[in-house]
Amino acid sequence: MNLFKYFREEIIKSVEAIVPGLDTSKVTAEPPREVSHGDVATNAAMVLTKAAGMKPRDLAEKIAEVLRAHPAVTGVEVAGPGFINLRLADSFWFERLAEVLAAGTAYGQSDLGRGHKVNVEYVSANPTGPMHIGHARGAVFGDALASLLVKAGYDVTREYYVNDAGSQVDVLARSAFLRYREALGEEIGEIPEGLYPGEYLKPAGEALAKKHGPALKDKPEEEWLPELRGFAVDAMLDMIKGDLAGLGVRHDVFVSERGLVEAGKVQDALDYLTAKGLIYEGVLEPPKGKLPDDWEARPQTLFKATEFGDDVDRPLKKSDGSWTYFASDIAYHLDKYRRGFGAMIDVWGADHGGYVKRMQAAVKAVSEGGGDLDVKLCQMVNLLKGGQPYKMSKRAGTFVTLRDLVEAVGKDVVRFIMLTRKNDAHLDFDLDKVLEQSRDNPVFYVQYAHARCHSVMRHAAGMWPDAVGPVPGVEVLAHLTDPAELGLIRLLAGWPRLVESAAEAHEPHRVAFYLYDLAAAFHGLWNKGKDDTSLRFLIEDDRELSLARLGLLRAVVGVIASGLGIFGVAPVEEMR
């Protein structure tokens, strides 16, 4: 139950009882900024004052009068110019705690997105080598966002777009051919400039030698290049999939750019736009500032991107007559739309920020306004050790591999830390700090809360065999009267709202912030028990109170596990 949604409906009912027929779409119910102000705050009187023909405070008092009769409400205050703050009965919170316990890790599951399909495309790295640390953040972000949307009830497809039609694939094929010759015993010396130098291509060369023997060695390029394009791309994709699997990242669909081109879908998309009058031959204005050396005023095939919010119209063909990347991307997004995805989310690196407007313009054009593209840009990750910039050993060319990072600190640590900042903010990843056992290390702090709960439950099972059997009912949970206990229940009851708001905003980092706050509230209660023995979770001569507190711990365990599940992180029952 999203209690804030529930009370929004109750507030709207109270408004209807006073002034029927008002537009209540702007009415909100949310946690007050200050905990001391109550449990639920609403702007109803402020946003409806004009339509109701009443002063805000007068309307607020009338709404408050109706709400005071609600059985879960113990107090209603009108604050400032007309804000309304509600205080809820302890019994209401005990019912919410029972709800958490009944649902377990399914608590927070929502039907917000029921009936809505969403395509989340992430990673989509060029298939020219292994994954590196620069790919890790977008991979984890996209995977966690997809899981968050599933938790909120959306029908999600996780997609990877394989850029296998560009000139870089020819370079990859030639690089693989060089490693093939090496596998046959030829001394290749230094890798020529323009080819990929990484050791990671050696297995591809060896596989080619095993498959063909020396048969390809003396053939002209035009005979072996077509086969090696596909072979090398497949080899690199297998490597990438292995890297992603090591990070716990998965995709449902891999879409080939070359497949789109060969199926005529690029031409089809441009024919569609031409029929709509959105493609023309023209000459672009020179770019502002210093002109690039290779810029020339020449007629080009252009898309009318400015009609859909872009700054300039965009070229669709290169000077050699081949399609631009943008033309292929238009076809790809039209293909997504025709597969039933009106809602699309693309996760890109921050260096692609200048590409956002044109892509959103293209989606508007090909979907005639029916499609929506949200582009999430992931900023750089700064790798540190002991607070200083750090470069790990490089086993694959000139970059740090994702596999190196996962081997150094573990999959779960990488995933959690990558989600502790908003995607468009720079992230520091300190190899020492992420392994510290302190509250400054969020992944440890959250996991420690989960493990501590399990430690208490194991101890309780030794005291009372049925201590962690059936979940306690409301009458037992009513023994939780300490303000810190009630505060923890309020935090747990806010999880469904957090899931929905994070899903709507496409911001999984909110889950990390919430889990940290939940862990802090739990650790605070634990520490109170060290100072005051009456607040310990287990009191041998008060079984009922102990069972109530065990119920609270079981709820904390369920919600932490639920949040970590969204992140693809396994909750631990013991710290090692």
Swiss-Prot record:
HAMAP family, per database record: Arg_tRNA_synth
One Pfam family recorded for the sequence: DALR_1
GO MF term list: arginine-tRNA ligase activity; ATP binding
GO biological process assignments: arginyl-tRNA aminoacylation
Name under which the protein is recorded: Arginine--tRNA ligase
Keywords, sorted A to Z: Aminoacyl-tRNA synthetase, ATP-binding, Cytoplasm, Ligase, Nucleotide-binding, Protein biosynthesis
InterPro entries reported in the protein's UniProt record: aa-tRNA-synth_I_CS, Arg-tRNA-ligase, Arg-tRNA-synth_N, Arg-tRNA-synth_N_sf, ArgRS_core, DALR_anticod-bd, Rossmann-like_a/b/a_fold, tRNAsynth_Ia_anticodon-bd
EC number: 6.1.1.19
Disulfide cysteine pairs (residue numbers): none
GO CC annotations, alphabetized: cytoplasm
PANTHER family the UniProt entry points to: ARGININE--TRNA LIGASE, CYTOPLASMIC, ARGINYL-TRNA SYNTHETASE
Annotated catalysed reactions: tRNA(Arg) + L-arginine + ATP = L-arginyl-tRNA(Arg) + AMP + diphosphate
Top-rank EC class of the record's enzyme: ligase
Family, similarity comment: Belongs to the class-I aminoacyl-tRNA synthetase family.
Subcellular location: Cytoplasm
Subunit structure of this chain's protein: Monomer.
Record-linked PROSITE patterns: AA_TRNA_LIGASE_I
Gene source species: Paramagnetospirillum magneticum (strain ATCC 700264 / AMB-1) (Magnetospirillum magneticum)
CDD domains in the record: ArgRS_core
Motif ('HIGH' region): 125-135
